[in-house]
UniProtKB/Swiss-Prot annotation:
Protein source organism: Staphylococcus epidermidis (strain ATCC 35984 / DSM 28319 / BCRC 17069 / CCUG 31568 / BM 3577 / RP62A)
Record-linked SUPFAM superfamilies: PRTase-like (SSF53271)
A UniProt-annotated Pfam family: Pribosyl_synth
The protein's name: Ribose-phosphate pyrophosphokinase
Keyword Zinc: no
Ligand binding (Mg(2+) 1): H137
Entry GO MF terms: ATP binding; kinase activity; magnesium ion binding; ribose phosphate diphosphokinase activity
Entries under InterPro entries matching the protein: PRib_PP_synth_CS, Pribosyltran_N, PRibTrfase_dom, PRTase-like, Rib-P_diPkinase, Rib-P_diPkinase_bac
Quaternary structure and interacting proteins, as annotated: Homohexamer.
C-alpha cells in the first residue's frame, strides 16, 4: 500500500468485470476502497450498470481491460463511462491494461476496417477524458485518440524479474524478438539487462509451405529470452523457441505483457521448448488457460502510481522514460 492520504479524497476507483483482482490490488496500493457499482445482465444479454454512491465532482478511474470476452467487456466500459458522465463526475479516466482490437490498427487488405480507431471513437464519444494504457500493440494507436493517453510500459517489470531470478545470469542471455515488428521492445529489455539481441526472420517460401525461421544474431550456448507484447495462440512463440533450441540455445524463456492465451496456447506452451513463461496480470488468466510453467507478475503498483500522478496533476512520464 502506498499511502492512506487519498482515503477521503475525491478520487474514485471502479472495477467492472474485466479484471476485478487487478482493480482491487490497484485500489489497495493507492490506499482507498473500490467504488461501489453493480454490473448485471438482463436475460437477453443487455448490460445494466448502477453506480451505488455519489461521484459528483469526483475524479473517476475505471479499471477495465477489454480482453476476452472482448465485446462484452468493451460494452461494459462504454456504458460505465456514460453512467459516470450522467452522474456529473468531474473527470472520467479509463485504465485499460489490455486494449482489445489493437491488432486491427490498419488496413491489411482492401475493404477492411480499422477497428482500433473505431474503438477509440466509441470511447471518446461515450465521454472519457483520459486513458491510461499498458503496452499498446501499436504505439501509433495513441494517435487515434484526441484525449490524453498515458502509455505505460511493461518491459521494466519483466526486466526486474530476470535481474532477480537466481537461475538466470544476464551476462549469458540474449533477448530475442520473434519478428521484425518487436525489435524496439526487445531492444528496451536488452538495454536494461545489458545483453545482445537476436531477431527471428520468418519467411514463407511459397503458399502452403511451412515458414522458415532464420535467426539473426548469436544465440549458441546462451539463455534466450523471447519477448512479445501479446501471446495469443502461442504458435509463433513455440515455433521460435524450438528454432532457438535447434540453433544451440541453452535454455529458452518467453515473456509478454498480455497473456491472451486462447485456443491451443496452454497445450502448445507446456509441450514446447519454453522452460518458463513470464506474463503480467494485465489480463485475468483463468487457471484452465494458464500453462503449468507460468510465472505471473503484477502491474498493479505501476498503474497505482500512474493514477496518483494523474490525480495530482503531476507528470506520468517518469514512470516510462
Amino acid at each position: 500500500m502506498l499511502n492512506n492520504e487519498y482515503k477521503n479524497s475525491s478520487m474514485k476507483i471502479f472495477s467492472l468485470k474485466g479484471n476485478e483482482p487487478l482493480a482491487q490490488e490497484v485500489a489497495d496500493h493507492v490506499g482507498i476502497e473500490l467504488g461501489k457499482c453493480s454490473v448485471k445482465r438482463f436475460s437477453d444479454g443487455e448490460i445494466q450498470i448502477n453506480i451505488e454512491e455519489s461521484i459528483r465532482g469526483c475524479d473517476v478511474f475505471i479499471v477495465q481491460p477489454t480482453s476476452y470476452p472482448v465485446n462484452l467487456h468493451l460494452m461494459e466500459l462504454l456504458i460505465m463511462i456514460d453512467a459516470c458522465k450522467r452522474a456529473s463526475a468531474a473527470n472520467i479516466n479509463i485504465v485499460v491494461p489490455y486494449y482489445g482490437y489493437a491488432r486491427q490498427d490498419r488496413k491489411a487488405r482492401s475493404r477492411e476496417p480499422i477497428t482500433a480507431k473505431l474503438v477509440a471513437n466509441l470511447i471518446e464519444t461515450a465521454g472519457a477524458n483520459r486513458m491510461i494504457a499498458l503496452d499498446l500493440h501499436a504505439p501509433q494507436i495513441q494517435g487515434f485518440f484526441d484525449i490524453p493517453i498515458d502509455h505505460l510500459m511493461g518491459v521494466p517489470i519483466l526486466a526486474q524479474h530476470f535481474e532477480n531470478d537466481p537461475d538466470i545470469n544476464p551476462e549469458e542471455c540474449v533477448v530475442v524478438s520473434p519478428d521484425h515488428g518487436g525489435v524496439t521492445r526487445a531492444r528496451k529489455l536488452a538495454d536494461i539487462l545489458k545483453t545482445p539481441i537476436a531477431i527471428i526472420d520468418k519467411r514463407r517460401p511459397k503458399p502452403n509451405v511451412a515458414e522458415v525461421m532464420n535467426i539473426v544474431g548469436d544465440i549458441e550456448g546462451r539463455t534466450a529470452i523471447i519477448i512479445d507484447d501479446i501471446i495469443d495462440t502461442a504458435g509463433t512463440i513455440t515455433l521460435a523457441a524450438q528454432a532457438l533450441k535447434d540453433k544451440g540455445a541453452k535454455e529458452v524463456y518467453a515473456c509478454c505483457t498480455h497473456p491472451v492465451l486462447s485456443g491451443p496456447a496452454k497445450e502448445r506452451i507446456e509441450n514446447s521448448a519454453i522452460k518458463q513463461l513470464i506474463v503480467t496480470n494485465s489480463i485475468q488468466l483463468e487457471e484452465n488457460r494458464k500453462p503449468n510453467n507460468t510465472k505471473e507478475l503484477s502491474v498493479a503498483g505501476l498503474i497505482a502510481k500512474a493514477i496518483i500522478r494523474v490525480y495530482e496533476r503531476e507528470s506520468v512520464s517518469v514512470l516510462f522514460d
